């Protein structure tokens, strides 16, 4: 794929030749990035189906590459916005830990995102077969993969145990999906031998929600841990000193300060080129920039307005990652699905100006709430945010989940026009001419300029007469209130580019542990239809209906923008552009491929 350089010092991820050309143009002494021991995904080969089963899409297996004899040494230092305490048990772990763990990676999944697309390729599974009706998946577990800390070889028993942990989690964002598909009441699971796991979901499911659990790096992955460690040492030890399978294993950690990761020598897939990696928790952008400029950090999660600071460092370069994230603006308290029942969520409150006391979309109460929601959206100048805070590294977007290739599916009228005068008029029509109070909180998850862009939204709302209480708090503080459905404000929330919109739909259902604060009977019905549609045409038709309904009702999945990401590369490391996994690109990934200069 071809990309124009917005900045001559930026390396656009693409072919190795383009990468090297860009590096040399910047005067870097970096050379081609080789891989080390194990398995790499650039040159896939087909995995045949067995028993006459036909798969909707072919699966592939990675190929072996030569082993390097170089001895590991040195430390790779990385600056993160937020880590929290190290956690690794699939039942007890939430985000940001899920995402940080598999971006490193400490943890691995059955599949992995490719280097040149976000299609899922086999990793801990050598491949999988899918029945023609999409109901039975047979996973062929990779042989010879050892767990960290001496807990033996991974088998299908560990895989089923790990998925069961995810399915019974109160923190994992796709726990309800894992339970519905892998542990359905009408389904079954069979371990036919130590390396074969057969899952019958009871009813057919689209591959989209399944692949989201299989793929890394993502904040929604189902990773594999040692059942033996859990049984032998207990849940707490398995949670804080997790035996997983990644190229890095957890060593020492201190909450609020650092995670120290040790390289796994002779790793089955890719041995790191550094003996250690330390992930430092540094919430302030200015402190991360200072650490990079003084040479204490080799790379860090960076706001786009820090690009000039990075460029001032002798020998430093930048890697541009196109279409890395999409951001949405969510209004909480719209949990209509169980409103008025004993199971009503605490956040539901029809006194909130954007929440209707009647879930009937044809009711006057609903129409009034729509006016308020529309007023909030068209008060925001999305293009100005892209031009100023994202420095042009992105574009406006209408619906979250459709960001990227699926934007081509929007109907002509589906866009949010910046019109503050109309915003004020709509508020007056709804009975809020003098505005109202609202809490706005950025979900701090490592996306470019996520706090600054949310602050801009607060200012736009202030301009139309709202009294905005802006909360800048750690995501580990915010997220439990979203899970419990107690939060009643708005959030700016960045997520990954989806393989399909359906991938993000579970968080708008009543059964999901994580919630974007918007649940409705119509969405429950249509999301189920999309997620169980085996045929692509049927799934897309359901997605389009969902998108249109959310746009017309200004209800949920409201987009702000799609942004590229830019990762700083310090003078002591080489760029690794050909080894970035095209999964969730909010977090830096590919650390196991980074080489010293």
PLM regions with names:
Residues 77-132, 164, 241-245:
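N-terminal lobe/hinge region of extracytoplasmic solute-binding protein
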Residues 391-413, 565-572:
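Mature extracytoplasmic/periplasmic domains
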């Amino acid at each position: 794929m071809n990309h124009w350089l917005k900045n001559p010092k930026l390396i656009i991820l693409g072919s190795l030749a383009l990468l090297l050309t860009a590096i040399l143009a910047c005067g870097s002494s970096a050379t081609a990035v080789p891989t080390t021991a194990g398995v790499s995904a650039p040159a896939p080969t087909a995995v045949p189906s067995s028993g006459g089963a036909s798969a909707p899409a072919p699966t592939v297996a990675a190929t072996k590459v030569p082993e390097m004899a170089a001895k590991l040494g040195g430390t790779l230092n990385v600056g993160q916005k937020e880590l929290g305490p190290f956690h690794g048990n699939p039942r007890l772990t939430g985000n940001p830990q899920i995402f940080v763990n598999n971006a490193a990676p400490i943890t691995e999944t059955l599949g992995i995102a490719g280097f040149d697309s976000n299609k899922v390729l086999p990793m801990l599974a050598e491949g999988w077969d899918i029945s023609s009706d999409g109901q039975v998946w047979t996973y062929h577990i990779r042989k010879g993969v050892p767990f960290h800390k001496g807990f033996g070889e991974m088998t299908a028993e560990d895989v089923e145990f790990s998925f069961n942990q995810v399915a019974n989690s109160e923190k994992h964002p796709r726990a309800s999906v894992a339970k519905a598909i892998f542990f359905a009441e009408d389904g079954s699971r069979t371990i036919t031998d130590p390396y074969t796991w057969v899952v019958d979901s009871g009813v057919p499911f689209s591959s989209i929600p399944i692949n989201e659990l299989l793929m890394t790096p993502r904040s929604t992955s189902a990773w594999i841990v040692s059942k033996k460690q859990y049984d032998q040492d207990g849940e707490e030890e398995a949670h804080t000193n997790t035996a997983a399978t990644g190229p890095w294993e957890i060593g020492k950690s201190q909450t609020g300060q650092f995670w120290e990761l040790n390289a796994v020598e002779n790793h089955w897939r890719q041995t790191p080129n550094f003996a250690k990696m330390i992930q430092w928790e540094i919430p302030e952008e200015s402190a991360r920039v200072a650490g990079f400029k003084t040479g204490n950090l080799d790379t860090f999660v960076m706001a786009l307005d820090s690009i000039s600071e990075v460029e001032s460092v002798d020998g430093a370069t930048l890697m541009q990652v196109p279409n890395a994230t999409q951001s949405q603006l969510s209004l909480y308290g719209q949990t209509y699905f169980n409103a008025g029942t004993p199971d009503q969520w605490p956040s539901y409150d029809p006194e909130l100006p954007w929440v209707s006391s009647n879930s009937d979309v044809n009711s006057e109460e609903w129409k009034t709430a729509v006016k308020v929601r529309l007023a909030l959206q068209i008060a925001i100048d999305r293009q100005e945010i892209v031009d100023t805070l994202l420095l042009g590294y992105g574009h406006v977007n209408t619906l979250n989940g459709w960001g990227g290739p699926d934007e081509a599916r929007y109907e002509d009228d589906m866009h949010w026009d910046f019109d503050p005068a109309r915003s004020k008029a709509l508020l007056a029509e709804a009975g809020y001419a003098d505005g109202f109070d609202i809490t706005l909180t950025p979900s701090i998850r490592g996306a470019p300029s996520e706090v600054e862009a949310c602050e801009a939204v607060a200012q736009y709302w202030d301009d139309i007469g709202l009294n905005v209480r802006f909360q800048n708090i750690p995501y580990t503080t915010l997220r439990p209130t979203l899970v419990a459905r107690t939060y009643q404000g708005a959030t700016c929330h960045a997520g990954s580019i989806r393989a399909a919109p359906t991938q993000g739909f579970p968080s708008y259902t009543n059964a999901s542990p994580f919630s974007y604060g918007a649940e409705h009977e119509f969405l429950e019905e249509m999301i189920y239809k999309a997620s169980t549609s085996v045929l692509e045409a049927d799934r897309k038709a359901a997605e389009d209906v969902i998108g249109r309904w959310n746009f017309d009702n200004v209800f949920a999945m409201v987009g702000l923008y799609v942004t590229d990401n830019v990762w700083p590369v310090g003078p002591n490391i080489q760029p690794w552009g050909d080894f970035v996994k095209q999964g969730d690109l909010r977090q830096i990934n590919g650390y196991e491929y980074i080489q010293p200069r």
